[in-house]
Amino acid sequence: MLQPLIQDRDRLEQVLRQLPLAPGVYFLKDKTDQILYIGKSKRLRSRVRSYFREPAQLGPRLERMVYQVAEIEFIVTDTEAEALALEANLIKQHQPHFNVLLKDDKKYPYVCITWSEPYPRIFITRKRQFGNGGDPRSDSAKDRYYGPYVDSFRLRQTLALVKRLFPLRQRPRPLFRDRPCLNYDIGRCPGVCQGLISPQEYRQTLQRVAMIFQGRTGELVAQLQAQMAQAAADLNFELAARLRDQIRGLEHLGVDQKVSLPDDTVSRDAIALAVGDRHAAIQLFQIRAGRLVGRLAFVADAQSGSAGTILQRVLEEHYAQVEDVEIPSEILLQHPLPEPDFLRTYLSEKKGRAVTLTVPQRQAKAELIAMVQRNAELELARLQQASDRTQTALEDLAQLLGLDTLPHRIEGYDISHIQGSDAVASRVVFIDGLPAQQHYRHYNIRNPEVKLGHSDDFASLAEILRRRFAPYLEGQGETPDDWPDIILIDGGKGQLSAVVQVLEPLLEELTLVSLAKQREDIFLPHQRQPLPADPEQPGVQLLRRVRDEAHRFALNFHRQKRAQRQRRSHLDQIPGLGYQRQKELLATFRSIDYIRMATPEQLAQVNGVGPRLAARIYRYFHPDAD
């Protein structure tokens, strides 16, 4: 296994000499061949060498990365712009740890349009997905996200208005097999489920909707006005009236904008940031036709570099995701960028027209940047307040449990069942005091003794913790990156004792606690009395949040499993209706009640269900029918 390059200067120099003085993308990898960082440069050798000259001057985050680099690879490109575009795609695909400059703050919503589907949907989400692991060649990589937006209330108002003005797909699955639902009858949906509109025609409608979230509402209104005039000339007054209503609704979107510029031809973005001890809050204002049409917000690691470096990285990540028509002619900057020519060339080539980058010094442009900065400072204050509360809770918890360092990873476990039936367990994970949902996990209880009428939370918890730590209990694994500092069990001394019997060999390496309900007592292994603690102190409140989240996650999975069993228990009693056909029925009708309401003809249209089986299903739910 290769050792870090910084510990082998001869090999480091040999690797650096192999890098060309040309534009391209470089990969920094650790000793396990994992990609730590992907970067781009117009001179690969010079850029990569700069990491190893004085690592301490790079900041704590990048210094930690440099001491892990064991291998360097690269791809040469013809131009700097090609390098930036390739870097953006590779970062999406691999998501390297040290490239995650922009933090995933669920506070900010996006609008998603699923262009990967024949009839795309449009909806609001707080989680941005990169399809197929971020592979830009995958179908789901075609989906488009607009945002993240600051004002979620206004965003929901805008989308609600859009859905009233334009007939759009309303449901992820059809409600009926042979007819459209009520949304079609009231003009909210064009009958997507029954193919009453072609995919091409429907996409034309959605492309108009996309223009709204691209900040091109004025351009869309002009198009609709021309189409309305043509419809009136063709005596198609119904279409002309519909277009008129759409125009009026779109004009209403911009009526209450508080920011407007005297030049109604202006198309520019303005970006500024505020940097604190841990976070950097970035705001980007989108000005189109002299009006503020969008406020985007980003959160970055304050240790990512200088203010200019953070701004450059945010702009690169943002504009790599947008379409060429969304790039403005001018971008106003709060601070100079370290590589402005790189970004300017990339944006100009992508837009097909010159894009200017300016740090304004006076008059209206400087006032606009000052306003963006004030908004960034307000957002930073919110972030700092939330971060301070979390830090206080971690410090209090470390003191309460006698830990030498602040707990980084806390795992919470809980069991859910009804008298032993459909028994499941959950694991939730908090990283640095915040939920890390990518590490959550469900468990099915495998113990055959746990069944209806015979519940055993002690045995269930012991089983789950044994499965979680099996490799380490058997001495087959080294301490991994996902090793928890604290394991929290929902329960009292009994639940804790059951888990202690399993994890006894590991108790010197981790802290095991249980949190009982009602009095919120905290128990430690081999101690009869609970820890003296105030239920309202910050550390205990953090444990309560972990415990409650584990309970919620387990309960939701239990309800899902129970509902699935109850649905299938009905269908299992119908002769000839196997597992696959049951899945088709439930996918089509979504519930037993809708299956019960369906006619034999509707049932027969389900894939794999012919007229004879449909009649049998119908008779099962309607035994008195002829």
From Swiss-Prot:
The GIY-YIG domain, residue ranges? 21-100
Which InterPro entries does the UniProt entry name for this protein?
A: DisA/LigA_HHH, GIY-YIG_endonuc, GIY-YIG_endonuc_sf, GIY-YIG_UvrC_Cho, RuvA_2-like, UVR_dom, UVR_dom_sf, UvrABC_protein_C
Q: Where does the record place a coiled coil? A: none
Q: Which GO terms describe its biological process?
A: nucleotide-excision repair; SOS response
Quote the Pfam families the UniProt record gives.
GIY-YIG, HHH_2, UVR, UvrC_RNaseH, UvrC_RNaseH_dom
Q: Which residues form the UVR domain?
A: 218-253
Keywords of this entry:
Cytoplasm, DNA damage, DNA excision, DNA repair, Excision nuclease, SOS response
A single GO cellular-component term on record: excinuclease repair complex
Q: Where in the cell is it found?
A: Cytoplasm
Q: Which domain of life is it from?
A: Bacteria
Q: Which GO terms describe its molecular function?
A: DNA binding; excinuclease ABC activity
What is the protein's quaternary organization? Interacts with UvrB in an incision complex.
Q: Could you tell me what this protein does?
A: The UvrABC repair system catalyzes the recognition and processing of DNA lesions. UvrC both incises the 5' and 3' sides of the lesion. The N-terminal half is responsible for the 3' incision and the C-terminal half is responsible for the 5' incision.
Tell me the protein family, please.
Belongs to the UvrC family.
PANTHER family associated with the record: UVRABC SYSTEM PROTEIN C, UVRC/OXIDOREDUCTASE
Name-wise, this protein is UvrABC system protein C
Q: Which organism is it from?
A: Thermosynechococcus vestitus (strain NIES-2133 / IAM M-273 / BP-1)
